[in-house]
Design a protein with these regions (language model features):
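Rossmann-like dinucleotide-binding domain that binds NAD(P)(H)
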Residues: 162-229, 233-239, 313-316
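Beta-strand-loop-alpha-helix segment that lines the small-molecule cofactor/substrate pocket
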Residues: 70-78, 82-127
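A contiguous active-site-proximal alpha/beta segment in oxidoreductase catalytic domains
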Residues: 63, 102-159
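Short, conserved SAM-binding/catalytic segment
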Residues: 47-55, 110-115
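NAD(P)-dinucleotide binding in Rossmann-like oxidoreductases
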Residues: 208-211, 224-293, 311
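Short acidic low-complexity segments
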Residues: 55-68
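C-terminal helix-rich "cap/oligomerization" subdomain common to oxidoreductases
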Residues: 1-3, 71-73, 221-223, 297-338
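N-terminal Rossmann-like dinucleotide-binding module
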Residues: 1-53
Length: 338
């Protein structure tokens, strides 16, 4: 892994998240070589591999028989990953696991103990958005005074995550909270540098084992021991703010995690300003740029043997909030887990 050697990445999954997001990024990284691509649908994997000019590997009956790689990207649904965790934990292969991760802290921690922290990455790439990192810095510096409260809203009537696995709880792991809303939860945790979290109240509306609406009140405890009140509204049943709002002592900041503009709205009480990002190296505005930055950070940490914000262990508080929200609705454990 040291020196100028290219990192060989194997990929499990050839669906949209891989073919439209990860492959355009990875195939444009000079220090990455795609070692192989496989999928349970061999024809689909072969077609995607041919389109990108990368090696295709037929999916073996036993995942442990997959070819060697320095890193494996698991770009498959939550419920299809269990056998791969077991197969790769003894091979010394680093792992990048697409979001969502887990429904319980226990299972999350169990995976973390099987890998070195720098060798196990999560897919919450919106941490790498320029606007998220800017707000994290503003909070740390106290530019607008202490952070008093935060809110994340996402969704509208009829807004349902795409994908053939979404209607199968054992494969998707959950509904709109778990599949998409978790991005906003993770962003709040990351920006506030939360070291603990407690869900004070949560209401979840379900249908056929899938959550369609969640509203919750959360207490985030920062590394400095400061409690920050946060609220969530994640829904495909009603309109939400579709943004993150951070309330400081002297200002309010608002932005969207999903519009790819990188814009930040500042309300100082006397004036409202729309702050457009200047063109700056390393400021990820689009989702593709954020994913590129996320991969760069992970692979850089892998080369150096040093964990960073891409480490799966760094997302444990996010999983704690997810677990508590589902527990409030009487749902416990990991759906379909062995």
């Amino acid at each position: 892994m040291a020196g100028p050697d290219r990192i060989r990445v194997g990929i499990v999954g050839a669906g949209d998240i891989v073919s439209r997001s990860h492959l355009p990024v990875l195939t444009n990284m000079a220090d990455v070589q795609i070692a192989w691509l496989c999928d349970r649908d061999d024809a689909r994997a072969a077609a995607v591999a041919d389109g990108y000019g990368i090696p295709f590997a037929a999916l073996p009956a036993d995942p442990a028989a997959l070819p060697a790689a320095d890193v494996v990207l698991l770009g498959i649904p939550y419920g299809a990953r269990w056998s791969y965790y077991e197969a790769f934990e003894t091979r010394g292969t680093a792992l990048f696991v697409e979001k969502p991760l887990f429904r319980t802290v226990q299972r999350h921690q169990r995976l973390c103990t099987a890998w070195q922290d720098h060798a196990l990455a999560h897919g919450f790439q919106r941490r790498s958005l320029g606007v998220v990192r800017t707000c994290r810095d503003l909070i740390e510096r106290g530019t607008f005074g202490p952070l008093r409260s935060a809110h994340f809203g996402m969704g509208a009537p009829g807004a349902v995550t795409r994908g053939r696995y979404y209607s199968t709880p054992e494969l998707s792991g959950g509904g709109v909270l778990f599949e998409t809303g978790v991005h906003g939860i993770d962003a709040l945790v990351y920006m506030s540098r939360a070291s603990a979290a407690r869900v004070k109240r949560a209401r979840m509306l379900m249908e056929a084992g899938l959550d369609l609406h969640t509203d919750a009140e959360i207490e985030l405890l920062t590394e400095d021991g400061v409690a920050v009140e946060a609220t969530l509204e994640i829904s495909c049943l009603r309109d939400t703010s579709n943004r993150i709002e951070l309330v400081f002592e002297r200002a309010r900041l608002r932005f969207s995690l999903f519009d790819a503009s990188g814009r930040l709205s500042l309300d100082s009480g006397s004036a409202e300003l729309e702050l457009a990002p200047a063109v700056a190296r390393g400021y990820a505005r689009t989702h593709a740029q954020a994913l590129y930055a996320h991969w760069c950070a992970f692979l850089g940490g892998l080369r150096e043997g040093r964990a960073n914000h891409t480490s799966a262990r760094d997302a444990l508080i996010t999983t704690a909030i997810v677990e508590q929200c589902y527990a409030a609705a009487g749902l416990h454990g990991e759906p379909g887990a062995p």
